[in-house]
Amino acid sequence: MIYRTATFRDVESIHKIVNGYAEQGLMLARSRNSIYETLRDFVLAEDPGEVVGVGALHLVWAELAEIRAMAISPDYAGKGIGYKIVQQLMEDARKLGVKTLFTLTYQPGFFAKSGFYEVPKEQLSQKVWKIRRCVKLY
């Protein structure tokens, strides 16, 4: 398995994986345009020739970032790929000097394995609330 940053040739794969879960109501959909606009945020897992997992680190403002768009192809789920992507995104955040890292998720148990914990939305800035609609703040 190769873990790497996304390139323009990966947009269709990212779109397919993320929106496959969005169609099931498990995450928010992403347009191709939004993927292009945030392409540099994405880290991918690639089984030679095939993108099988994606995740993104989005900088919100000084020292605050969000992990978003975490999705693994169903055939590769449960193999630790998502965990490795999150670890890479967390390392990228550390290198950038990010002190607070959060995710808005429908899958809190997945992120708990990487040390995330649930906080009441009232503890987060209004700016964070406006980022997206989601069931859980993590």
Question: Where do the protein language model's features map onto the residues?
Answer:
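Conserved functional loop/turn residues at catalytic and ligand-binding sites
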Residues: 10, 71, 75-76, 80, ...
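Small/polar loops that bind or transfer phosphate-bearing groups
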Residues: 6, 102-103
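Conserved active-site alpha-helix within GNAT-family acetyltransferase domains
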Residues: 95, 99, 105-132, 138
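Short amphipathic alpha-helix that is part of the acyltransferase structural core
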Residues: 1-29, 45-47
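Conserved acetyl-CoA-binding loop-helix of GNAT-fold acetyltransferases
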Residues: 72, 78-93, 103
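A generic "binding-loop/recognition-motif" signal
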Residues: 10, 63, 106-107
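A conserved beta-strand-loop-helix scaffold within acyl/acetyltransferase catalytic domains
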Residues: 29-42, 47-48, 53-64, 68-72
